[in-house]
Amino acid sequence: KLSEVIKRVDLIIEVRDARIPLSTGHPHLNKWITNKKHILVINRADMIAPETIANWSEWFKKNDIYPHWCDAKNGKGIQEICKSAKESRLSIDDRRLSRGMKVRPIRALTLGFPNVGKSALINRIAKKRVVESARKAGVTRNLRWIRLESGIDLLDAPGVIPPNLENQKSALNLALCDDIGEAAYEIESVAIEFIKIILQLKEDKNANISLTKISNRYGVDILKNVDQPHEWIDLVALKHTSGDRRRMAHKLLEDYRNQMLGKIALEVPI
């Protein structure tokens, strides 16, 4: 149980997805980490616009939260995370010494939903490949400790999904960003909801949506069937997948995930 694992560690390194930084926050984490050091890492910063990151940072600051934005795959932003972890270690060491306790390597837990990039982040922090990393949910399957040079023992936990993910909007966002396995959702329904979200967010600069880019890519104006997104997908399927709506839905989602439609943020600061 996650709450039991958290009791065994000194530091939580929480990893979220920049495209959906709210949906990838664990709903119960705050009540579990009351007396723990907490570093918030928002990975995949390369997948949204720099202006969106700046505006999200302002939003988080107003809520007294100071995340580290990074692109673990390409190693950007890793130094700041390592610096923050080292500062946390020194603070924990001081606290132990003040209580007459021996200094020991601190125990840190990397935590996040499946496929938010925890393994890539750990490999960057460790400066070598210590865990498997792949763009699919569920690569990490067991708890394992990794000894780092910086006096930190890092616990790599499998991606955690709350058993009752009550917020349906969050569940949809996780599916769109491939942060939960494909077996957990119906791909055609998710593709239709994706089009609805695109049309809802099209005026928000933070979402960074180009309807022209999407329309040109598929050869059908996305505003043509604005009230019936499934009809737009059917028209696009005729052009690209011989009328196969399921294949087209899969292609649409993969195009989004691979940034073929631009650096689109599915959640924006309010």
PLM segments and residue spans:
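Structural beta-sheet core signal
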Residues: 14, 40-42, 110
